[in-house]
Amino acid sequence: DRPRVTDPATLAWLFYTSGTTGRSKGAMLSHRNLMAMTVAHLADFDSPDHNSSLVHGAPMSHGSGLYIPPYVLRGARQVIPSSAAFEPDEFLDLCEHHPGCSAFLAPTMVARLVQTGRPRPQTLRTIVYGGGPMYVDSLKKAMAAFGPIFVQLYGQGEAPMTITGLRRADHVDTDDAVLGSVGYARSGVDVAVLHEDGTPASAGEIGEIVCRGDVVMAGYWNNDDATRKTLQDGWLRTGDMGSFDERGFLTLRDRSKDVVISGGSNIYPREVEEILLEHPGVDEAGVVGAPDEEWGEVVVAFIVGSASPEELDTHLLERIARFKRPKRYEYIDELPKNSYGKVLKRELRERLA
């Protein structure tokens, strides 16, 4: 029998978003979307063949599963841990056993690999990281431990794995501004930063990140209202705030829902978190806004670590404006995360209610 020809617009995958800001929604991904993602991955990041292996350290229901198509296309093997979970030692053992290994991992998973103290298996060729913020200090530690094998992606379920990125070479002999960015537009994707009125933001100006291209979903399953709000004039409104620099590198500031507005000034939690994590007494940090009668919102930092509030205040005031400093610190054993390693900011806000 002849192979059946499928309309590229046909629904191929109903991909549910991670739901970090609310109820999970089903992004309708077509065959065209998955092919555009596959072509961009092969063009920008990796070139697997029949001697390559994709090791599924992250859940296959999320980013790791979306990377199956480019590796299947090239005849690579799929390696699934028997634990069905991310165990750093098991992951490294699998990489030592299989040839030409690549993997998609959340930044928190990369940090756990570094914490093992084990050297990089020679067969571990590529780690693509994404799905959450990779702080510059954490990235430098990972590169010191494993070498120049890292690739960054910025994407969403609505534009699977494919908005911007940094190649391996972009991580080498560069500055912190590049390492702290999410790279430049991927192949076949247009990316822009827009003000609230829809006008383009200039270099250095912060606005909402939007993108368009064959990678963008058809809409949300049985959710026309959310589709209308997210897909406008051919652009996918990501809900993320960011800015381009003069070189074309995009820096992700925060989710628009996570921006703290205090006394009329926008405070971007990621900036504060990045600096908090530079302190040796901080293992994890999550910054959110808390309601305040006088200021509208004030900054609150949830800390996993031993540094005192006084030490953190001193550390911050040497590095950022005073109005961005947390008004209080909450110490917890671990930041709440979903199964993909993303910090659940809404749960942090609920703790303050």
Regions found by a protein language model. Name each.
Residues Y184-G188, E196-T230, I267:
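Conserved ATP/PPi-binding loop(s) of AMP-dependent carboxylate-activating enzymes
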Residues D1-Y16, R23, S47-S53:
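Conserved pre-ATP/AMP-binding loop-to-beta segment of ANL
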Residues A12-V39:
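Conserved AMP-binding A3 loop
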Residues M35-S53, S61-C101, T116:
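Conserved AMP-binding/adenylation subdomain of ANL enzymes
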Residues A103, G213, A218-G219, K229, ...:
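AMP-binding/adenylate-forming catalytic core of the ANL superfamily
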Residues S24-G26, M37-A43, Y67, F91-L92, ...:
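Adenylate-forming
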Residues L11, T17-T20, L54, M60, ...:
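Conserved S/T- and glycine-rich ATP-binding loop of Class I adenylate-forming
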Residues L73-A76, G100-F104, V114-A177, D190, ...:
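Gly/Ser/Thr-rich phosphate-binding loop
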